[in-house]
């Protein structure tokens, strides 16, 4: 299979969030320097093939001292205990006319001629294989539920409020202005965007793109001071006014974008504002679901009352029921979203809540308080990254584990949802439940980058495609822009991340085609180099590469010709060198070079990647601290998933700079600072050397600062020193 080792037989779409036979979060993202090594993606790199990846220094001590150094220190051992595909993207189908669409459903649903079963053995073998794959599925997530037809209720509306033309729900989805919509769709087809820039108080800068033409210009940002300024269902309005009478600066600036149905890329998410962002997005999602459902029920009632209902054209729904998709990194992040939603809805009943708690909630403290705050936010609780969950709303009840086609909101990790969809080469492929998604919320997108971003790309490529089956749809009620294959222009995408990356930027420009517009909110950076709290000589060396494709080879050639000689010239001086390598593919290349090149034969080295076993990690750290390893190779994803406290670091070499500026501070200030405190390094003697190219400009801005990045990328000199 292109994306893993198995497909999964599903007991109702939305089930099966179980484990898989492959491990290791992440994989190649399509390029030679993708995050992670092999395709697939879960866990923290356990279960990879093992081979020699170290060279010990020759010591004159006796065998007893050698055996003692093999054992990890008490500090390291305790930390170990506590830390314990090439995708063939489905082409987007050409626009179908309403008649052609109906004919395809009629053809698919027509009786099929009976065929003799000629190959019984083969079919039985396939059934056995499916059963074996089912055994590897998490039973707690299985859904045994029939797919329901369209909503037929005629009563039970949350509140029978009048349609408000000023409501963004009306203006964007229900009754958009035909003239404005037509004009903007034409601009979208031509790829024309008019830029508007505005300053958001205490937040950053918003660059808003509206389908149209014209020169970029500044505009005053809109703000909403409290929930009073939102068009909310009355029940939600009553609850949120009690919880949040007024908005903070972030909510005031972001609310107009979110509730105005514009696409949003927000790259300033952190542990301090995570709760506010979660509340705002969940409120918006539930408000959208309630308005959609109430409109359908209200129109059902109208049709039931009217004598001449054939004259009524009430287009109020999509092909399938699910309207909101939330892509999240872990089960714990799903728990936080669900808890926020229940606090806003205050349902009288919660069906299958105990089952949800048993499957998703883990109240044990997995990590000690010495782990960074952002690490504990991401990995606290149940950190399994293989899950999917359907949530269904009725008038008084929230139902967990509803079948996808019966759900209003789908929560999933990228891996969990991709396995639910299936693979194009497999017999069972189903993405019709994504055909009518109107809001996508991607929270902690930077964490998803450290898993396998190709799963996210795959999911976005399968959003809002016209369905292959009717699924009981009443086509007389389907909105015209669904039938015209324009749903992608109405979908709102919201991505929340701690920082911007080329992958997020690409998704923002290629997948965000919202006719309402899109906004990117970011801030300026003073630079992590100024936030170390430690005197360290920091040297940044620029390499010039012609293209991003040639960057890995140019970087390797620079490393072997300019940096390796400084280590081998006096191998004793190389002791305590930490070599940080962001990409797993680069890590493999450098590790093999250390293992096989005669040039590095005088250097002893160890290595820690996301696929290194805990026992091997402990040994590598112990040998590095004792001096048996001069050099320690260390990947960014290993640091992301474990945050090891490595001792004995006297010099840091960065083969490439990290995406996350927090990692820079933890490695440079944290590791070198610890060596100073423990007396292994004289104050002021620690050093850093980092290699970068113009393709690293986003990373470099966060590390060196917004004011310095352009000079470092464009100036003639290629070496920049900071103290």
UniProtKB/Swiss-Prot annotation:
One of its GO terms (molecular function) is U3 snoRNA binding. It is found in: Nucleus, Nucleolus. This is U3 small nucleolar RNA-associated protein 25. One of its GO terms (biological process) is maturation of SSU-rRNA from tricistronic rRNA transcript (SSU-rRNA, 5.8S rRNA, LSU-rRNA). Component of the ribosomal small subunit (SSU) processome composed of at least 40 protein subunits and snoRNA U3. Keywords: Nucleus, Ribonucleoprotein, Ribosome biogenesis, rRNA processing. One of its GO terms (cellular component) is nucleolus. Residues 1-159 are annotated as: Disordered. DEAD-box RNA helicase-like protein required for pre-18S rRNA processing, specifically at sites A0, A1, and A2. It comes from Botryotinia fuckeliana (strain B05.10) (Noble rot fungus). Residues 60-91, 124-150 have a biased composition (Acidic residues). Residues 11-40 have a biased composition (Gly residues). Belongs to the UTP25 family. Residues 100-109 have a biased composition (Polar residues). The keyword Ribonucleoprotein applies.
């Amino acid at each position: 299979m292109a994306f893993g080792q198995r497909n999964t037989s599903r007991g109702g779409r939305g089930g099966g969030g179980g484990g898989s036979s492959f491990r290791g979060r992440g994989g190649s993202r399509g390029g030679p320097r993708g995050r992670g090594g092999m395709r697939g993606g879960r866990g923290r790199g356990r279960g990879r093939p093992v081979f020699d990846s170290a060279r010990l220094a020759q010591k004159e001590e006796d065998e007893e001292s050698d055996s003692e150094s093999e054992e990890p220190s008490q500090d390291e051992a305790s930390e170990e205990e506590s830390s314990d595909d090439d995708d063939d993207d489905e082409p987007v189908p050409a626009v179908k006319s309403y008649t052609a669409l109906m004919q395809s459903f009629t053809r698919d649903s027509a009786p099929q001629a009976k065929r003799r079963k000629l190959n019984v053995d083969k079919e039985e073998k396939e059934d056995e294989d499916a059963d074996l794959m089912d055994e590897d599925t998490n039973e707690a997530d299985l859904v045994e539920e029939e797919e329901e037809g369209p909503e037929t209720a005629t009563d039970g509306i949350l509140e029978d409020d009048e349609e408000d033309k000023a409501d963004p729900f009306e203006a964007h989805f229900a009754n958009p202005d035909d003239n404005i919509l037509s004009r903007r769709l034409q601009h979208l087809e031509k790829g024309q965007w008019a830029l508007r820039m505005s300053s958001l108080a205490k937040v950053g800068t918003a660059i808003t793109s509206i389908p149209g033409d014209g020169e970029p210009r500044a505009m005053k940002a809109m703000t909403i001071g409290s929930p009073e300024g939102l068009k909310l269902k009355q029940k939600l309005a009553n609850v949120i006014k009690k919880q949040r009478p007024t908005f903070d600066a972030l909510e005031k600036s972001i609310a107009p974008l979110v509730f105005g149905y514009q696409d949003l890329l927000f790259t300033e998410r952190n542990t301090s504002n995570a709760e506010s962002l979660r509340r705002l997005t969940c409120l918006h999602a539930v408000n959208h679901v309630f308005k959609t459902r109430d409109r359908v029920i209200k129109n059902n009632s109208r049709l039931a009352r009217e004598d001449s209902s054939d004259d009524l054209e009430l287009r109020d729904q999509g092909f399938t029921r699910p309207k909101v998709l939330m892509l999240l990194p872990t089960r714990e992040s799903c728990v936080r979203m669900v808890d926020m939603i229940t606090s806003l809805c205050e349902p009288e009943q919660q069906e299958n809540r105990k089952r949800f708690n048993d499957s998703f909630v883990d109240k044990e403290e997995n990590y000690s308080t010495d782990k960074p705050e952002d690490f504990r936010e991401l990995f606290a609780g149940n950190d399994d990254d293989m899950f999917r969950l359907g949530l269904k709303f009725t008038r008084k009840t929230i139902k967990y584990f509803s079948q996808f086609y019966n759900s209003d909101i789908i929560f999933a990790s990228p891996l969990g949802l991709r396995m639910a969809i299936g693979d194009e080469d497999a017999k069972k492929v189903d993405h019709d439940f994504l055909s009518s998604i109107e809001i996508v919320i991607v929270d902690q997108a930077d964490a998803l980058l450290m898993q396998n971003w190709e799963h996210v790309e795959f999911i976005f490529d399968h959003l809002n495609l016209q369905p292959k089956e009717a699924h009981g749809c009443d086509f007389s009620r389907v909105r015209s822009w669904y039938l015209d294959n324009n749903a992608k222009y109405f979908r709102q995408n919201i991505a929340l991340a701690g920082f911007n990356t080329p992958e997020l930027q690409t998704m923002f420009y290629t997948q965000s085609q919202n006719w309402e517009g899109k906004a990117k909110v970011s801030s300026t950076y003073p630079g992590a180099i100024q936030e170390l709290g430690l005197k360290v000589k920091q040297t940044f060396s620029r390499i010039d590469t012609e293209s991003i494709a040639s960057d890995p080879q140019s970087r390797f050639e620079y490393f072997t010709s300019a940096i390796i000689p400084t280590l081998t010239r006096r191998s004793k001086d190389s002791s305590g060198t930490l070599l940080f390598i962001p990409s797993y593919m680069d890590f493999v290349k450098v590790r093999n070079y250390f293992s096989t090149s005669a040039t590095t034969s005088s250097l002893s080295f160890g290595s820690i990647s996301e696929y290194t076993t805990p026992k091997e990690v402990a040994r590598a750290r112990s040998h590095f601290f004792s001096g048996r390893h001069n050099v320690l190779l260390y990947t960014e994803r290993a640091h992301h998933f474990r945050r090891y406290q490595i001792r004995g670091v006297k010099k840091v070499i960065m083969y490439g700079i990290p995406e996350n500026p927090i990692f820079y501070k933890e490695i440079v200030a944290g590791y070198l600072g610890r060596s100073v405190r423990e007396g292994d390094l004289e104050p002021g003697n620690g050093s850093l050397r980092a290699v970068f190219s113009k393709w690293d400009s986003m990373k470099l801005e966060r590390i060196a600062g917004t004011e310095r990045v352009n000079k470092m990328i464009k100036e003639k000199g290629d070496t920049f020193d900071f103290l």
